[in-house]
């Protein structure tokens, strides 16, 4: 019998704390009954909320801590004040100590990345971690990274992300040779900053077993032009938030238009099934959850403001990463595929101050 997937939850993370975290965990548990949980947070509060989730309570244990990383805390402050005591740190530490297979938090992104990087460390050959998101596209789904782990990138780190993103796409989408593109301001080879152009040269010329297809632009992400889109964290995070905002905006436009006249209401009723499919496709909660790639352990970041359904999607992703042995597959992908050292200015370190 297969052992259950052990998930460590930062029960206090996010805008809504245990209420959303535990409700989302139970939704995911219905889909993946071979899961157990360790809940890190205020024992009294977690126990009280858990009374409403008996199925989750039956497969969970609580580890008390009353130290919580705030959404506005700087990563350096979070590390100094409660590094070894906070619910966020304890969840990550459980992965390091092999007490859990994966950690999930909806807390402060910068603090989570700083703690994960400090505690788990990067894999051999990886200069820094990246956050990878699953992106709905016209052709299905793609992997986009980095979406906010750090600002700026060297050519070497972009190539590392291409290798890790390819491994993730193989795991998630069951692809033999996922296509990879570098996000740029144009598809012509002469365009872009030097780091991006140098990364493109390495991916073209070095034998890294990456199915590189060239530069892609912002509109190619949603079009699904490639299976993996690689970019640095600043532009990646802006692209992610823009896409989420656009989806919500279009949803609001549709709701307003459908209720404007009686003809529109009748039309909505006649096409209700089609609108339901559209609504599900545009729901950003379906793609909630970013994977911290490049660390010696799996950490999943949920949006802080998500609801129970959104958090459940992040827990689902955590489950899939463990069941599909993402860590082992990335390590295997890195063997013999290290990009050469390239001269590039060192950008701002991972765990950017003020991220949330």
Curated annotation (Swiss-Prot):
SUPFAM superfamilies linked: Isocitrate/Isopropylmalate dehydrogenase-like
Pfam families noted in UniProt: FA_synthesis
A Gene Ontology cellular-component term: cytoplasm
Pathway where this protein functions: Lipid metabolism; phospholipid metabolism
InterPro entries to which the protein is assigned, alphabetical: FA_synthesis, Phospholipid_synth_PlsX-like
Localisation: Cytoplasm
Keywords from the UniProt entry: Cytoplasm, Lipid biosynthesis, Lipid metabolism, Phospholipid biosynthesis, Phospholipid metabolism, Transferase
Gene3D superfamilies associated with the record: Isopropylmalate Dehydrogenase (3.40.718.10)
Class in the EC hierarchy, top level: transferase
Catalytic activity: a fatty acyl-[ACP] + phosphate = an acyl phosphate + holo-[ACP]
Family recorded in the similarity comment: Belongs to the PlsX family.
Cited function: Catalyzes the reversible formation of acyl-phosphate (acyl-PO(4)) from acyl-[acyl-carrier-protein] (acyl-ACP). This enzyme utilizes acyl-ACP as fatty acyl donor, but not acyl-CoA.
Subunit-structure text: Homodimer. Probably interacts with PlsY.
Protein name per Swiss-Prot or TrEMBL: Phosphate acyltransferase
Source organism: Xanthobacter autotrophicus (strain ATCC BAA-1158 / Py2)
Gene name as annotated: plsX
